[in-house]
Amino acid sequence: SGKDFKTGQTLVKSGFAPIIGTRCLGLSGWFSTNILGNRDGLVLDEPANFHTKEVSKLSTLETILKPDVQPDLYGHGNDEDTQYYHKVRINYYPPRNDNKEGWDNIDIFGWMGYPMQVKINFLCRDSILAAPLLLDLCLLSDLAARAGRYGTQRFLSFFLKSPMHDYTKGEEAVNNLYQQYTMLKNAIREMGGYEADEEID
C-alpha cells in the first residue's frame, strides 16, 4: 500500500532511476516540473498542499539510488556539495485541463566524471492513467482479502507513491518500479497457491 497514485513523474523516476543505479552512473541533479490544469493542479498550486507531494517525490530517488551505499555517485551525509540536487515543481495552468505535461532534466556523469544529460518530456492525461490503477487496486485488494491477507499490502506499491512498510520487521521502502513489479507478480502467485518464482534484488 502507499499514498497517491503513481501515474506521472514519480512513475518515470521509479522506472528511470534504476537504470542510472544499475549502470553505476553518477547523478549531479534531477529537475522536474509539471504543468496541469485540472483540480489536482489547482490544489497543488497552494504551497502547503504541494509540500506533501514534494516530500514523496523527493524520497523516491533516495531509496532507489542509496547515497549511503555509493557516496561517490550519489552523495552522502548532510554536505550539500556532495549531494545531487533534486528539485520538483508543479504549476497550475488552466488551458491544459486534464492534460498533464512533465519535463525532467537529469544531469548524470559517467566514466572519468564525463557529464551527460537525459531529457524526458511526458505528455499524458491524468485521469486516463489513474482510472486503470483504481480498478486494479480494487480487484487486487479484494483478492488479498479473499486470500486472508490483511494489513499493509506491500505488493500494491507498484501502483502508489510513498510505499508503506513495517519498520518493526526491518522492512525498507521499495520505490524501484521493477522490484515493485516483482513483488506484485510474486504476491499474485502466492495468492493463487503457487510459490513466488522471482527474487527481489
Locations of the language-model features?
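Conserved anion/nucleotide-ligand pocket segment
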Residues: 2, 6-80
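Context-gated lysine
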Residues: 3-6, 13, 53, 57, ...
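Glutamate identity and glutamate-enriched acidic tracts
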Residues: 46, 54, 62, 80, ...
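C-terminal active-site/capping subdomain that shapes the small-molecule cofactor and substrate pocket
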Residues: 109-201
